[in-house]
Amino acid sequence: MTTHPIHLHHDDPAHGGERACMSRRSFLLAGGAMVTLASLPGTAVAALKALKADYPAVKIGKLSRLKTGEPLEFAYPYPDVNNILVKLGAEAGGGVGPQADVVAFNQQCTHMGGPLQGTYKAKHQALGPCPLHLTTFDLTRHGMVISGHATESLPQIVLEVRGDDIYAVGVQGLIYGYSSNRAGR
């Protein structure tokens, strides 16, 4: 088998006037270097730190005051991040309370950040459709997409019950517009 070196020149008539910008050997060496760099310990440590973000515990409501199908809005983990707390009346993924039916979700569509305020449908236990591209989310299944353009579930607010008080203690999923939920925009 004969091999031909590949040069940066684009004027070789034998190859239609175009040549690749890199030899196979150079490509394999560069690819191997990238894999090696990606596996360095510093990269893995940064990823683990992102998974262990510390969130403040914030009291957001009382179990005794929640009515089935009537959502309450609250801000968490930042003052400008709007969320919804709702008692669904049926067991839900990530739900708290005696029936595991109290859940909380961020109110920005994960597709393009469309506002979901006022779109809760108690009959279907869903949030949406988003006014931008009609994505709808199932609140009984960790906010997964029912229909529409979004490919990610809604960020779910992690809840804790202490007596009658409900606390937001974390966020499961990335809030739209943030590179990291605890690192800011």
From Swiss-Prot:
Binds 1 [2Fe-2S] cluster per subunit. The keyword Oxidoreductase applies. Its main location: periplasm. The keyword Zinc does not apply. InterPro entries: AioB/IdrB_ssu, Rieske_2Fe-2S, Rieske_2Fe-2S_sf, TAT_signal. Residues 69-168 form the Rieske domain. Predicted to be exported by the Tat system. The position of the signal peptide cleavage has not been experimentally proven. GO terms for molecular function: 2 iron, 2 sulfur cluster binding; metal ion binding; oxidoreductase activity. Keywords: 2Fe-2S, Iron, Iron-sulfur, Metal-binding, Oxidoreductase, Periplasm, Signal. [2Fe-2S] cluster binds at residues 109, 111, 130, 133. It is found in: Periplasm. GO terms for cellular component: periplasmic space. Its cofactor is [2Fe-2S] cluster. It comes from the Bacteria. Its EC number is 1.-.-.-. Residues 1-46 form the signal peptide. Involved in iodate respiration. May accept electrons from cytochrome c551, and catalyze the reduction of iodate (IO(3)(-)) to produce the chemically unstable intermediate hypoiodous acid (HIO). This intermediate then undergoes abiotic disproportionation to yield two molecules of iodide (I(-)) and one molecule of iodate. The resultant iodate subsequently cycles back into the reductive pathway. The initial reduction of iodate may inadvertently produce low levels of incidental toxic H(2)O(2), which is detoxified by IdrP1 and IdrP2. Belongs to the AOX family. The iodate reductase (Idr) complex is composed of a molybdopterin-dependent iodate reductase (IdrA and IdrB subunits) and two associated peroxidases (IdrP1 and IdrP2). This is Iodate reductase subunit IdrB.
